[in-house]
Design a protein with these regions (language model features):
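Non-catalytic all-alpha helical scaffold/repeat segments
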Residues: 1-253
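Short amphipathic alpha-helical heptad-repeat segments
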Residues: 264-276
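Short, charged, amphipathic alpha-helical segments
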Residues: 289-299
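Short, charged/polar, low-complexity loop and linker segments
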Residues: 276-282
Length: 315
């Protein structure tokens, strides 16, 4: 590494961007690690810089790691390697643990997480989660980019391209507003919902309110009584219930199941019974919420019968 200091710019660029892991002795002085970061940022590729940060993350302070990570945004991103997502996840994990309660640093990290949205999974975008859970402004901004306004605005090619770029990140954003450590406080949730509705009205997109809210509320934690959703979300559903909210909630809840084995309808029958029990527990105090869970239960009952008959026909 010492020899490369004396080389010309082209040689330095070749050295720092080559597909060979950069090695720095564990016995090197602290200033060597900082020098390597600066040189790799100047001459290396996104992947070599990221790999270097991962390798020396325990050799520099968390503040230095934070600063160096933010500076990734200045490097042109090349094709992701097979290890890119792992390196990002590990580096972000350190920074999230240290700075998620620092509003300014959390916002900076959320911006960087968003830049890496095509590589990071949603569960690893903890600062972006916090930003969206605490305030609906950014989520509403994404809605304004992706969906047309109520006045049938003309969509130009530039906006269409932007919508395509951000949609994957929007689609990943599955969260219950204001949820923190498995708890949702009604007053906070209602405030979030009201602000979100106001933003949609200002964007001339009020028609989307029920659909979008239903999609998010399906990610509520379990209530204190052991039934879903939690009490605060039940209260909000009772207050803001619409057919579109119900439909979106049902779809989001059923989509959580993901890929599953076909077993002649046995799994669907169990789900039917589980959702029916949940609905019956809510029926007296939260009729609209119960209606949502009865609908999910009925859907699984029909699917169970269909799978059973199909299995019988195959025999």
């Amino acid at each position: 590494n010492a020899l490369i200091v004396k080389e010309n710019e082209d040689i330095k660029k070749m050295y720092w961007s080559r597909n060979v892991r950069l090695r720095i002795s564990d016995k090197a002085e602290h200033r060597v690690f900082i020098w390597a970061i600066n040189e790799c940022k100047k001459y290396g590729s996104f992947n070599t810089y990221l790999e270097l940060l991962y390798d020396i993350k325990d050799k520099i302070s968390v503040q230095e790691l934070y600063k160096a990570t933010l500076e990734m945004s200045d490097i042109k991103c090349d094709v992701a390697s097979s290890m890119t997502d792992y390196y990002l996840k590990e580096i972000f994990n350190i920074l999230q643990q240290n700075f998620i309660d620092d509003d300014e640093k959390c916002a900076e990290l959320a911006t960087l997480e968003w830049m890496c949205r095509n590589v990071l999974e949603w569960e690893h975008m903890k600062c972006m989660q916090k930003i969206m859970k605490d305030d609906p402004t950014f989520y509403a901004l994404l809605v304004s980019i992706i969906y047309k306004a109520d006045d049938n605005e003309n969509i130009d090619e530039e906006k269409r391209k932007l919508a395509n770029k951000v949609y994957s990140g929007f689609d990943k954003a599955k969260f219950c507003p204001t949820e923190k450590d498995g708890e949702v406080i009604y007053e906070n949730l209602k405030k979030w919902i009201e602000k979100f509705k106001e933003l949609l009205i200002n964007q001339k997109q009020e028609r989307l309110f029920g659909n979008l809210v239903g999609r998010l509320l399906a990610y509520s934690p379990i209530g204190e009584d052991g039934y879903s959703p939690c009490e605060a979300v039940r209260m909000v559903i009772e207050e803001y219930y619409t057919d579109s909210l119900k439909t979106a909630y049902v779809v989001a809840e059923e989509n959580k199941r993901g890929v599953h084995m076909v077993d002649s309808g046995k799994s669907e029958l169990i789900l039917h019974q589980r959702y029916q029990k949940n609905a019956e527990a809510l029926q007296e105090r939260y009729p609209y919420t119960a209606d949502i869970y009865f609908s999910i239960s009925d859907n699984y009952k029909r699917e169970a019968e269909y799978e059973r008959k199909r299995a019988e026909d195959e025999w």
